[in-house]
């Protein structure tokens, strides 16, 4: 899931409310501290440096993540990115094929106004289908 929109609309709050026990991924390739959580949140992505990794981490195939001293299996089912930028905006310097590959891996939510709890529950139900 890719949640984007202006600052202050509750993107991070929405992600944390939807996946309260998620692993909070840093903006780098390292997965230190990950212990098999089903949900991962990459909050406030603001650079295109992870394009290659996102294609791997957000695909439906099994993959590994790098931790200091080795690799670990990534067992997540849901990967959430929050950003002020859309996929097109953040990866504008990449070729169309790479952007399309990233878009295929995400359900996109454009938040333009603060969300309400009921709307969040309805959206979670819709995305679970």
Model-derived regions: residue spans:
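Conserved beta-strand position immediately N-terminal to the Walker
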Residues: 1
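Conserved glycine(s) of the Walker
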Residues: 5-11
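Short, polar loop motifs at secondary-structure junctions
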Residues: 8, 26-30, 84-86
């Amino acid at each position: 899931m890719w949640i984007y929109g202006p600052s202050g609309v509750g993107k991070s709050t929405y992600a944390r409310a939807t996946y309260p026990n998620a692993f909070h991924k840093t903006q780098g390739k390292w997965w230190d501290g990950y212990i098999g959580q089903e949900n991962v949140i990459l909050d406030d992505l603001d650079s295109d440096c992870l394009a290659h990794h996102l294609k791997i981490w957000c695909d439906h195939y099994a993959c590994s993540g790098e931790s200091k001293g080795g690799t670990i299996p990534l067992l997540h089912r849901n990967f959430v990115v929050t950003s002020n930028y859309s996929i097109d905006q953040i990866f504008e310097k990449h070729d169309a094929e790479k952007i399309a590959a990233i878009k295929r891996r995400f359900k996109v939510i454009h938040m333009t106004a603060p969300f309400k709890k009921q709307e969040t529950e309805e959206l979670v139900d819709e995305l679970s289908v």
